[in-house]
Amino acid sequence: MGGGPAGLTAAYLLAKKGVSVTVLEADPDYLGGISKTVSYKGFCCDIGGHRFFSKSDEVVELWNEILDEDFIKRPRKSRIYYKKKFFDYPLKPRNALFNLGVFESALCVLSYLKARAFPVRNPANFEQWVSNRFGSRLFSIFFKSYTEKVWGMKCSEISADWAAQRIKGLSLWSAVKNAVFGAGGSSGGEVIKTLIDSFHYPRKGPGMMWESAGRKIEKWGGVIKMGQEAVRISKTKDGYDVVSRSPGGEEFHYEADFVISSAPIREFVGCLEPAPPADVTGAANALSYRDFLIVGLVVKDRDIFDDNWVYIHDPSVKVGRIQNFKSWSPDMVPEAGKNCYGMEYFCFEGDGIWASADEDLIKLASEELVTLGLAREGDITDGFVVRQKKAYPVYDDKYADNVETVRAALAGSYPGLCPVGRNGMHKYNNQDHAMMTAMLTVENILAGKDVYDVWKVNQDAEYIEEARDSDSGGRDVPKTA
């Protein structure tokens, strides 16, 4: 269930072993889930901005196996836009000092020293976690506005788990060390994902990887059904009966020994028949998600900025981040003298942004791009809108308990139902983590027993054999057969 990185990784590895697989993907046009590439008049749009970087050699090997020569190396450059100025990210002290000014920089240093001397013990929310590592003043400058745009909630209401997973290992000191010694630190230390200076990328966006995986799955006898969404999963004597529905309302039945689901937990649990106990369905329904849309703007290319993306820390505009698709890969832009920017807006399905007409969103994005100084009046020649439901699982103060309730119920009463990936496990991690959960699920299926607890895969796509603090390391994942 699901044709994103997790679902397709599982199908790819199983089909390669000769196992009969069927992939149900609700999108009628694109494979890749939130890692798809949307094409508009030849302009390629990466709807979420996907760097292909992993500490897991196994994941990297699989990427190279799937795509091979179309998997290119690209420089990483991103900056923060704050008070009409661009700040390098990772932090470069001279740049930050110049942009902030001596007085503001001194206040930031004092705030950082105070945080180190008097940290919040056992930080429970995002604001506390980040302030402990950067100081409250830098938190307010470089984290607060953007993060609250992403989640639509105050930083004090966001679980510290999200910060620990997304910016693990990063602090003001590590950023300064990176500026002086490079991403590996002064002694060749561990690379922090947030600080990498290059990454690999498919020539025409992440969807190119997953479309290639789909073709190979079908070559090995696997079946991919586009435009079919699972609506019921019923236990049978030998496994499960999965019912999918097409956009036209036609239903299809599939018999399965195992069901691997990367669908959002809330939807997945809602498909189960008979329904699980009330506490389980209640826990699933209590999980929430943040939705997302991107406005693609085709512009005259004036080389105003060459970042892969720019984080907008300006509360006067609604855009949260701007992607520069030509900087991801020149092959994503088909016309000389043109570029395509992706204006990212975070929202909830049905709210004002989400429900706006495409022409209104294109007008809003165009005005904000000019206001920010990243385009001139008359530079924007075309535009399009892509909406993505349930792009981000929300980490509120109850999410961990709710996920555990569902996980325990599935493990105890539904053998052979295997949640994987970001939404399938309600873990806001990158695609290498999603892929590793699928890889280990396949290992369990092929072994005929639970060799690995997939829930122990950490944010770095590493398998942790014993419970440890989220900042601890783990051994490399086992090689698949």
Predicted regions and their residues:
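N-terminal Rossmann-like FAD-binding beta1-loop-alpha1 element of flavoenzymes
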Residues: 1-23
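Conserved Rossmann-like nucleotide-cofactor binding loop
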Residues: 6, 29, 266
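Active-site/ligand-binding neighborhood in enzyme catalytic cores
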Residues: 9, 96, 106-234, 239, ...
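Glycine-rich FAD pyrophosphate-binding loop
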Residues: 15-39
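Short phosphate-binding/catalytic loops that engage adenosine nucleotides
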Residues: 19, 222, 374
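Dinucleotide-binding Rossmann-like beta1-alpha1 core, especially the glycine-rich loop
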Residues: 41-118
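C-terminal segments that line or cap access tunnels to active or ligand-binding sites in enzymes
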Residues: 256-258, 262-436, 443-455, 466-469
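Acidic, Ser/Thr-rich low-complexity intrinsically disordered segments
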Residues: 463-481
